[in-house]
Amino acid sequence: MENGVMMQYFEWNLPNDGMLWKRLKDDASHLHEIGISAVWIPPAYKGHEQADEGYGTYDLYDLGEFDQKGTIRTKYGTKQELQEMIEELHRNQIGVYLDAVMNHKAGADYTEKFMAREVNPDQRTEQLGEPYEIEGWTGFNFPGRGNKYSDFKWHWYHFSGIDCDVVTGKK
């Protein structure tokens, strides 16, 4: 088996212009000519806002297809553009690796009240004090997507930790 060459085709400060998928599609033949055999692309799913790089994950099933969080496209483009880019890369014998963060959630649709217990910030397995009621951004119902692809909705009981109590601001 021949050793391949993979290129990371993104960096943190890309413009929020929705053009990355188009640029990569247009660059596919050039990448093939210079010996690139695979590209690593940023998270393709909807973040908590359009400018999100994909690490503030809102909806893993929305690749730029649904009107959610004030936008249809992601920072990088639409689902259609993503599919066309992948097809063009494959035509040029270039593999595609997606960066994905499956355990991040951001931009919940609503808050929920639930019992929580404070933990030691230096040793998160050490619980401090008794459980008490807090309110957190933990409700995700994906109104723009509805139940397409999945009917799963996130609630407080799906999380093992949150950032803060929205009522008190305590972290």
Locations of regions flagged by a protein language model:
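Substrate-binding/active-site clefts of carbohydrate-active enzymes
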Residues: N3-D26, E33-S37, P42-K171
